[in-house]
Amino acid sequence: MPQPYPFGRVITAMITPFNAEGQVAYDIAQSLAVHLVEQGSDGLVICGTTGESPTLTWEEELQLFRAVKEAVGDRAAVIAGTGSNCTREAIAATQSAATLGLNGSLQVVPYYNKPPQEGLYAHFRAIAEACPDLPLMLYNIPGRTGQSLQPETVARLASLPNVVAIKAASGNVEEVSALRQLLPDSFAIYSGDDSLTLPMLAVGAQGVVSVASHLVGPQLQALIQAFEAGNVARAQQLHHQLYPLFKALFLTTNPIPVRAAMELLGWSIGLPRLPLVPASAEIRQALASCLTELGLYTA
């Protein structure tokens, strides 16, 4: 189906598989990427928060971009997580990613150094102008970065031709309302929280950058398409059906729970890298219960 938005409706923020020695398992990453596309993902974010970008080297990230693009080709948008709190590093990483034929780049709000809004504007503008041929998705996640990208700043950035979307992960539906009022219809807003996908659709979002789509991609596609078709009751039904899983996937720091869930479903994706640790037995049991209820898992 042709996608009306720059990266589709359902974009999976993909986990990074590791082998028993803790090295990136590129072959499993390729298999997982193909599986996710077959299960309804229109796009894949590689080396984002869920992909454990803080503990990957640049060489590992670049090889992951290559491997995933090789695996999925043109069947899905491949979006490189090349953001940084150092503008020069973000530009260099994004320029390198642009040479690989990827479809876009995810640019997180600079973390820890907490620039003011004018600094955020200058940061993203510098990246956009240095990489004019690569579409950029802004990424607002103040719970991790310590700073929020304000709607007015996003509106200024939207005037740049290759700044085409935002992942809104503040947990604030009012932010999406403000964004939609300020931005052109061509600028895509993606929910950054699975549990807020339906509420954000109601105020003007187009889709979701999802963790849960590792497990329930077809259902998320059905939810969004039902809403688009005006079948709000069906969208609500799917939302409530999936809601326990949405919450279970954030019982502790992402991506710990989704990695455990994928292991329960038979994926050999290894342990997260320190300082992240494996899911507790209690969290694994909660995930198993949710997956069983959805008909996805049998103990």
Swiss-Prot record:
Organism superkingdom: Bacteria
Keywords in alphabetical order: Amino-acid biosynthesis, Cytoplasm, Diaminopimelate biosynthesis, Lyase, Lysine biosynthesis, Schiff base
Enzyme nomenclature, EC number: 4.3.3.7
InterPro entries: Aldolase_TIM, DapA, DapA-like, Schiff_base-form_aldolases_AS, Schiff_base-form_aldolases_CS
Protein localization: Cytoplasm
Gene Ontology cellular component annotations, sorted alphabetically: cytosol
Location, primary (coarse class): cytoplasm
Encoding gene per record: dapA
Species for this entry: Synechococcus elongatus (strain ATCC 33912 / PCC 7942 / FACHB-805)
Keyword Kinase included in the entry's annotation: no
Protein name per Swiss-Prot or TrEMBL: 4-hydroxy-tetrahydrodipicolinate synthase
Pathway recorded for this protein: Amino-acid biosynthesis; L-lysine biosynthesis via DAP pathway; (S)-tetrahydrodipicolinate from L-aspartate: step 3/4
Active site, per annotation: 139 (proton donor/acceptor), 167 (schiff-base intermediate with substrate)
PROSITE patterns from the UniProt entry: DHDPS_1, DHDPS_2
Family annotation (HAMAP family): DapA
Keyword Transmembrane: no
